[in-house]
């Protein structure tokens, strides 16, 4: 729902699937002046077989972690990706997000997102957990088992819900950059140690992809021809007035050359 408007601005058509009728109504009201949006209410596993379109992009933002409930079966997360894969157009991509089960903040005293308890993911989920997060190796394994052989990992920081910076394997954070670690607005937490100093050591040891708080993954059945310039880093400076709020991207071409690009976040900044 939250992404529908921005996707509609960039795509010819957008299809939304929501289980909550209230969420569907809110989404429809919010986007009533936009064209090309279809909103379905109901269980994904019941709606997906009846979708006749093929999609260039499929977004599972927060949905993948809920796969056990969405696709009750022996291998629910793989089956969810397999179902989404069947809806892809040739060359299409699936974008999914997940909190990292081994994210540094969970060691440092943050509650687990879905159980509300401490260290649940680190110690291993029980069978009763309907939602769960994943480590990077777990994500890689289930994505490949679903038949999506090519994947690119990105690392939203502090997390994918309220990211201020997005890193990639081609542009990882540097020592001293990860200092904004107290953005847990929804639950109380402990402060077990200085996360900034811990991140500095993790970065120095080359382990940031293991302990990043969140993942954003772009997956394909097979690698298509790469874009001439691919964004490998984005930083949002939108805590300013709308006139001065910008996004800074670092793009990389096939030869490894890097280019900086600045984009206004709001129409006022484009004037």
Residue ranges: model-predicted function:
Residues 128-155:
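Short alpha-helix
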Residues 1-12:
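Conserved SAM-binding loop of SAM-dependent methyltransferases across substrates and taxa
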Residues 56-75:
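A short SAM/SAH-binding and catalytic strip from SAM-dependent methyltransferases
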Residues 32-46:
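Conserved SAM-binding strand-loop segment of SAM-dependent methyltransferases
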Residues 48-58:
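A short acidic, Gly/Pro-enriched loop at the edge of an enzyme's catalytic core
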Residues 95-118:
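Conserved class I S-adenosyl-L-methionine
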Residues 73-93:
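A short glycine-rich, Lys/Arg-flanked "PGG" loop and its adjoining helix->strand segment in the class I
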Residues 166-270:
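C-terminal lobe and adjacent flexible extensions of AdoMet/dcAdoMet transferase-like proteins
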């Amino acid at each position: 729902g939250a992404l529908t408007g921005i996707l509609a601005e960039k795509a010819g058509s957008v299809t939304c699937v929501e289980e909550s009728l209230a969420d569907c109504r809110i989404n429809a009201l919010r986007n009533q002046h936009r064209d090309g949006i279809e909103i379905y209410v109901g269980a994904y596993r019941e709606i997906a077989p009846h979708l006749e379109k093929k999609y260039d992009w499929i977004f599972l933002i927060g949905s993948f972690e809920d796969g056990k409930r969405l696709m009750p079966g022996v291998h629910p997360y793989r089956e969810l990706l397999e179902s989404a894969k069947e809806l892809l157009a040739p060359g299409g991509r699936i974008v999914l997000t997940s909190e990292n089960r081994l994210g540094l903040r969970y060691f440092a005293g943050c509650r687990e997102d879905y159980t509300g308890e401490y260290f649940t993911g680190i110690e291993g989920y029980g069978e009763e957990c309907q939602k769960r997060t994943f480590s990077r190796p777990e994500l890689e394994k289930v994505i490949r088992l679903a038949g999506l052989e090519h994947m690119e990992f990105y690392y939203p920081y502090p997390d994918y819900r309220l990211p201020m910076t997005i890193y990639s394997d081609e542009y990882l954070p540097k020592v001293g950059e990860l200092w904004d670690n107290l953005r847990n607005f929804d639950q109380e937490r402990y402060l077990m140690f200085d996360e900034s100093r811990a991140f500095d050591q993790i970065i120095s040891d080359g382990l940031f992809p293991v302990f990043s708080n969140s993942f954003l993954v772009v997956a394909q059945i097979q690698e298509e021809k790469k874009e001439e310039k691919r964004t490998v880093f984005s930083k949002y400076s939108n805590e300013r007035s709308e006139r001065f709020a910008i996004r800074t991207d670092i793009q990389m071409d096939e030869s490894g050359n890097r280019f900086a690009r600045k984009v206004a976040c709001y129409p006022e900044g484009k004037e």
